[in-house]
């Protein structure tokens, strides 16, 4: 199908884009990668009166690090993160593990991280990473700029704190400490489907004891969530040598954390190919496995750097 008739504007500066978004009398959508927007327009699920194409605003196509913070501009494509050295330290490794799960190469070449946050699909890898890693979303309008913590930005499936007059110009992630181990595992029906469940982990261990952990859950509720209850069960736990991902003893801290995440943190929404009980089971299993992956990564980093465990 063809989309309904709409007006098109391609500004060259952020102020021009903001002026267009300030016209509250029109239904307006912002176009960056367009990998979700264009499809929905073709299917007549959304009918914007004006499409503001920001691809000519070159200042938005920037990736920078300052003050231990990564800033990702609104036009930075998914594929920019496929190589782990694109971002310093363990954060780059985590991003590279996550991004390969996003659709396929042509979509990763056009779609953007910030576009994923704007769309706010519960199965988005980037959205869960933003919540788990305490990212901030930068929102501009004609009156100025505001920062919204990712944990407060997502309001539900496809709903966010962004106002119609605002443009997301960037998202900011704190860098992870060099001795942080990371893991990301995704389960989906076929390779190009949305995630049925996915888990992201960042883990720090000192002398065999877990001192810090972050667990992000993808498609485990109507919005991306951080598994705070599961994280609390891990602080102070002794893990010894990481178990094999597929052979985790039931009494191991990683297995217990998975059960807590499934029972207390997650609020799954049933889908055609994944009911609530199925998702809870998958969450429990994947949290344990991803923690194993992160622990092995942490051990590798510490051994390589010669640090004490």
What are these regions (language model features)?
Residues 1-309:
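C-terminal structural segment of proteins
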């Amino acid at each position: 199908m063809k989309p309904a008739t709409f007006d098109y504007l391609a500004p060259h500066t952020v102020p021009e884009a903001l002026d267009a978004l300030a016209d509250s009398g029109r239904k307006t959508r912002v176009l960056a990668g367009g990998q979700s927007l264009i499809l929905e327009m073709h299917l007549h699920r959304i009918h914007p009166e004006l499409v503001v194409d920001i691809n000519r605003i070159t200042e938005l196509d920037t990736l920078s690090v300052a003050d231990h913070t990564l800033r990702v501009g609104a036009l930075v494509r998914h594929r920019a993160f496929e190589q782990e050295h694109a971002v310093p330290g363990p954060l780059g490794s985590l991003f590279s593990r996550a991004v390969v799960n996003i659709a396929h190469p042509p979509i990763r070449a056009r779609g953007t991280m910030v576009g994923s946050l704007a769309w706010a699909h519960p199965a988005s890898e980037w959205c869960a990473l933003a919540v788990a890693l305490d990212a901030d979303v930068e929102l501009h309008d004609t009156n100025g700029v505001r920062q919204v913590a990712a944990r407060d930005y997502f309001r539900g499936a496809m709903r966010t704190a962004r106002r119609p007059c605002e443009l997301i110009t960037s998202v900011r992630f704190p860098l992870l400490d060099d001795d942080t181990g990371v893991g990301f595992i995704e389960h989906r029906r076929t390779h190009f489907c949305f995630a049925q469940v996915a888990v992201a982990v960042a883990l720090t261990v000192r002398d065999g004891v877990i001192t810090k952990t972050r667990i992000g859950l993808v498609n485990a509720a109507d919005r991306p969530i951080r598994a705070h209850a599961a994280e609390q069960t891990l602080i102070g736990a002794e893990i010894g040598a990481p178990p094999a991902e597929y052979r985790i003893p039931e009494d191991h801290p990683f297995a217990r954390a998975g059960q807590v995440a499934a029972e207390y943190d997650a609020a799954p929404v049933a889908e055609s190919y994944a009911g609530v009980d199925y998702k809870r089971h998958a969450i429990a299993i994947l949290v344990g496995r991803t923690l194993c992956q992160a622990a092995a990564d942490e051990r590798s980093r510490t051994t390589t750097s010669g640090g004490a465990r």
